[in-house]
């Protein structure tokens, strides 16, 4: 028999599972198949009588294409839902969309080139609703490309009448329970959006602001022995335009103040800040003449420099000595602390800024100027009155509208609020029982709830859920349960458009009509909408909150996690969630935030088009997602390399399992016993990491496992697989292990790279095979012998030593391949002597001695297996095993 003919006697691997993944071609085909086969419904059916596990989807905003942050979020959720389903949990996942609010309203108006002031509310709402639906359809098609396991025909939208009615039932209960009130308070106000904002709608940017020191002349010393009429109180401000609403100067109750004398003029500042004031104001040769405590200043009157009011000096709880002068100008409607002080001291409440930021009649000659642009004229006025002592700029963090990215201000307006104080302790009590991943996040949420101020829930816009309040002839809110119920019934039937379509009387029960009632025209904060999802969304008729898991970005501690908790506790006195998992933001390779202007935006759809969704999903799983994560071509390529190793390993396993029928009764010995026990140990680690949502550990464990498996077990068993007789005992032990490893690997990767897992599963000759890998359950971890694993540690230490010797021998030219080497092992233990070291170390011969060394030994190569043997062992150019097999094939 010739050497070429020997190939016919070998057991060569064979599989149609391709080395090239072709994900971009295959993923749409698998997705189509899964939809056609109703895979998601069948997964639910499989587990319908089992313990439920519900990951409740926080709704993304129905505006624009998905970005890389969406991909990170949805893929993480999908991994968990798939994993839990394969663990046997009944795990329905209902995606939803946040559909109201200013971004949709503005984008619709911009795209349609319509002015907000000329379109009717009904037409605006109709167009906004249509726009939201178009955006949802667009995002659904994009989310599908992520290979998500869900039914996109069964989604929720916050604009659906059923949802809106549930939201209004919550609002009704909160009003009747005294949790909702209307009041005049300074709130975050966006001139660019012309509406109030909640804290969660505010972002901060570093900006340069004017920094000025202003002198206010005392006209009534109020009997003070230390202060004279004509002395000047010095305040420092970064918002000069608020001086038009100045109503008082606040001082620290326990601070020491002094008079700074300069050119016969006295300036009053805190003593601790006096030298800094002198330096900044360039008051050369100024002297600090007299000290006094705060009592000497209380009740003193001064003349406000811009509005000519006579104003008092009062105590301020917020005054500090960190910067400025220790005297703070108070404009009661332009700051929370200012408002408290203004209320406590019955100060003048001046509102000189309109909704759009333009100054009104109260600003006098500055009327008609945008508030920030008034600063230049104010500087001129102060200078003309010798009141501007110093002017500069300061760079600081300043609040901006998260939608328009333009500056906002604190502005006193009548708004609707949710009182947090009344339920704060309940909220904190509920947080005690929840778990967070990462663990430190729980403290973050507790701190936010502890410090949270009352929630401004009213918005001065049109596209949203109305605040269904009526006012009587005197302008007082009419709070009546029957009225609420009547409106809610109408909304459930017709949606909230009816609030704008009907007159007030048409929305009232008959007995309340013809009383001259008017409607509130503000809408609710969209965070109130999305915060209602646990109450308004029916995931399954038998499933109720609290749900097992909420998973969103870390910005949602002040957003959805926060509003959901408040709304749920207000309605049910219970948290809506048992556990929170949060992820960070996606940054570029340098750790910088992505922006179109920087040109560093990574589009997930482009990544999918180039690499496939499985590669993007692998990047997500492999990222330390609880922190901010990086993405770049290099990082994607690194994950592609991990993918390639996993795929090639599975291909090798499948190829060798061709035609094999699994026999779990096969008793494994030697290295095969070690591999069997190691596999169960790996399973345990992987399942534990999945349970802890530590997906990077899942990937690292699997990657390390396949790398080590390939370099050792898959390598040393090639002769057993190819050369031994098809049904030899050692080959059966090897293939039994291969089957178990393949079964584990395909299942373990299924939640993360579902297309690849399904592809591999189709080519896996599995007993009791199902129609899809995603209908399978994870196997339980079988008992394994850790002593076996420990026993083999000695061998692997020896293997590392021998490999180093072999590498040096090849480098020096002593041998070309390891199977040409004779290895002497120094004084091995009896355990080591018991191993088939020639096979395990893949060398030509093994000896034991007093020195470890590698030699080239006199050998001949077997023409069938290509291994080296001593010449005496070779017969007809074949080693003993190959000779025996060939003779058997030839019928001898």
From Swiss-Prot:
A motif ('KMSKS' region) lies at residues 593-597. Keywords: Aminoacyl-tRNA synthetase, ATP-binding, Cytoplasm, Ligase, Metal-binding, Nucleotide-binding, Protein biosynthesis, Zinc. Pfam families: Anticodon_1, tRNA-synt_1, zf-FPG_IleRS. One of its GO terms (molecular function) is ATP binding. Zn(2+) binds at residues 862, 865, 879, 882. InterPro entries: aa-tRNA-synth_I_CS (IPR001412), aa-tRNA-synth_Ia (IPR002300), Anticodon_Ile_BEm (IPR033708), Ile-tRNA-ligase (IPR002301), Ile-tRNA-ligase_type1 (IPR023585), Ile-tRNA_ligase (IPR050081), M/V/L/I-tRNA-synth_anticd-bd (IPR013155), Rossmann-like_a/b/a_fold (IPR014729). L-isoleucyl-5'-AMP binds at residue 552. A motif ('HIGH' region) lies at residues 60-70. Catalyzes the attachment of isoleucine to tRNA(Ile). As IleRS can inadvertently accommodate and process structurally similar amino acids such as valine, to avoid such errors it has two additional distinct tRNA(Ile)-dependent editing activities. One activity is designated as 'pretransfer' editing and involves the hydrolysis of activated Val-AMP. The other activity is designated 'posttransfer' editing and involves deacylation of mischarged Val-tRNA(Ile). Belongs to the class-I aminoacyl-tRNA synthetase family. IleS type 1 subfamily. HAMAP family: Ile_tRNA_synth_type1. This is Isoleucine--tRNA ligase. It comes from Mycoplasmopsis agalactiae (strain NCTC 10123 / CIP 59.7 / PG2) (Mycoplasma agalactiae).
